[in-house]
Amino acid sequence: MDMSKKKSKRASPIESSQEEIAISTSKTATTEKPKKTKTTTKKKASQPSQEVVMETESEVEITTTTTSTSTTNNNNITTTSTSSQQSNGTLSSSSSPTIQSIPTTPISKYIPSLSQIGTPLSPNRAAQRLREKDELSLIHNRLKSALKKLESAETELEKKNQEYEELDQKHTATIKQLKQRSDQVEKQLIEEQNQNSDLTSNRNILENELKSKESVWKKEKDEILLKFQESINKLNQENSLAQSQLKSEIVSKEYEIDGLKSEINRLKDDLQYRIREGEEKSRKLLENEYNRFKGKEEEYNQLIVSKDEEIKKYKFELKEKEKSSNAMNKKENELNNLIQAHERQIEDMRDSINREWELKAAQMMEEHHARTIHLQQAVDSFNEEKERIKSQMETLNGQIEDINIKNNEYEDRIKEMNVLLSQKDNSIGELGVEIEESKKKMRKQMADLKSKDGQIALLQIEINTKDNKCNTLQTETNRLKSELYSITNQIDPEIPLDPEINSLKELVKGFEKTVDDRKRKRSKLQHEFNAAANQDQNGMTIEEQSSTSTTTTTSATGSSSSTSHLDNIDSSKLPTGPEQSELFNPDTVSFSLVDSNQEFIKLSVHGDMDNGLSISKWRLIVVKPDGSKSGFSFPDGIQPFKGIKSVTVWTGRPRPQGTPTENEFYWARTELWTSPVEGTIVKLVSPSEETTTVTLPADGIYQKPSSAGKSNCLIM
């Protein structure tokens, strides 16, 4: 409606200009009529007519047209005068008079001399009319040019209106599309916000899970540290007890040595006194006895010096132990003070003995003849005491060697535990660093991302990486648990094993029962086969057939019967193995093979068919040519072996992870077989301290000879 109104308003100036042209033509026609033809119009009392003002972009400007009516007194003629104002030298507007009477040209208004002309038919009037025609023709030409300009402007306006309408339609369409797009974008934003909230909740859940796992790891680490600390405290207590016992024994032995020294000095005084007062023969005898006792005194002095050196050695060892444990400082200081006090007492006793010797020299010589027999008895008892002391010293040295071996084992285990702790600390530190880096990366990515699609993709990638890390952490925990389990299997039997081993034993109890039944059947068949082999070769085949027939008839139905039958046949058809090649000696353990090149020790265990033989608490000791020793003890809980079994001890390597091992043990001590190997002694010690010894040759391989039979076996 607005566009139609605009078009009507814009078309009105053209119509007014056409009406004006028609009026001007009619006016020229009326001027050629006689004078008396008059144009009459209805009178209107000063009613101004206003024209529609039109605006154009280039040439048309605002114009105001005023129409005035003037009436003459004689003929009542209404005259209209138009005045137009033009700015900037262009036609700005056109007049549209109210068509009520035929207008006349108001020339007399501008030329006052024309108003005095008498009649219209005068020649001045005709000239005036001619001028008016010229003016009208000029006005017509101007109006035509103005009309052309108006038409061109109107066409341009119509074009612009059409363009405006097209643009308006396009804008409305684009606005609708933008509104639809904005609605879609708002929906997408809502969906993405929901997805983002879900992802953030998932991320928080994952972070909580990681925190819980970290707390579990920390708890496990604290438990392991407590266990290690308890084991270390136990080892320190055992070491302190052993050292205190040794020190007490050393003090007692020193006291006995001091008593013997005092007795020797007393005897020396007797001899010297009798030598002075007696005859020459007795003097010679006493001199010989004196020299002999002097040699013994020197020996005892050497023993004292060696004991002093041992005391110094113990002091040095105590000082070294003082660096490793703070709890031993007070005890070591007390022991050092006791040793110094004893040394002072020894010196005081020596001084007092020397004084007493000077005082009692005369008295002792008088009693010499009476005590010669007693002296001989004392010498004999002294020799016996000497032998007893030597045996005690040997036992003490053996105990010290065992303690050193145990200390080496404990040090190896402590080193392994420290390595495991460092590995766990490193893994926990790396995980913490990775978590912090992932958090930083996630923050940067959340800040740098501009589109929600990219955020979702990155969050999914982060979740996948966290899942992978969780999986890797779980595998790492399983691996560390298996390593701890393998380490606990190698711990000294005096230290109690973890409860996990008992639970694992309960889990595999059913499997062990089936395995024991199968081994029992096989061992019976082997025993029967060995007995038959000693009698006759033909009897062996008959025994095999009978044993296989009995096992097939008495075995269970299904797959278990077929497998046991096959196992029995296989065991009966292998007479050349290491278990069948030697005679069966129940309740014995012997060396079968010692190979220093491939680093393993193979033992042959002969267990009773009823109760079996367990090698728990048995020990292996390797003595190098330079005197250094290393020991390995079999752990508790080893099932008894029935029949002839081969047990292998691998040295210098840890227990393999994820692979079951049967009758195999692992001694993690490294550099056990370093050159030179020749002369290395390998000892097998039973719980009752019975020892079997093997010496390695130059090639480092010892193999039990086939004819030896029982030469290296330890009979229980």
From Swiss-Prot:
Annotated motif Nuclear localization signal, positions: 519-522
Composition skew (Low complexity), residue ranges: 62-107, 546-564
Composition-biased stretches (Basic residues): 1-10, 35-45
Domain LTD, residue spans: 575-698
Subcellular location, record wording: Nucleus lamina; Nucleus envelope; Nucleus inner membrane
Occurrences of domain IF rod (ranges): 132-515
GO terms, biological process: centrosome cycle; centrosome localization; chromatin organization
Traits of the deletion mutant: Nuclei are misshapen and disorganized, with irregularly condensed chromatin and centrosomal detachment from nuclei.
Effect of residue 122 to A: Fails to localize to the nuclear envelope, and instead forms nuclear aggregates which persist throughout mitosis
Chief location bin: nucleus
Annotated region described as Disordered, given as residue ranges: 1-107, 519-584
PROSITE patterns to which the protein is assigned, alphabetical: IF_ROD_2, LTD
Gene Ontology MF annotations: structural constituent of chromatin
Coiled-coil region(s): 130-450
One term under GO cellular component: nuclear envelope
Domain of life: Eukaryota
Entry keyword annotation includes Ribonucleoprotein: no
Function: Lamins are intermediate filament proteins that assemble into a filamentous meshwork, and which constitute the major components of the nuclear lamina, a fibrous layer on the nucleoplasmic side of the inner nuclear membrane. Lamins provide a framework for the nuclear envelope, bridging the nuclear envelope and chromatin, thereby playing an important role in nuclear assembly, chromatin organization, nuclear membrane and telomere dynamics.
PANTHER family tied to this protein: LAMIN TAIL DOMAIN-CONTAINING PROTEIN 2
Oligomeric form and interacting partners: Homodimer. Lamin dimers then assemble into dimeric head-to-tail polymers. Ultimately, two head-to-tail polymers assemble laterally into a protofilament with a uniformly shaped rod of 3.5 nm in diameter.
Protein name per UniProt: Lamin-like protein
The organism of origin for this protein: Dictyostelium discoideum (Social amoeba)
Classification lineage: Eukaryota, Amoebozoa, Evosea, Eumycetozoa, Dictyostelia
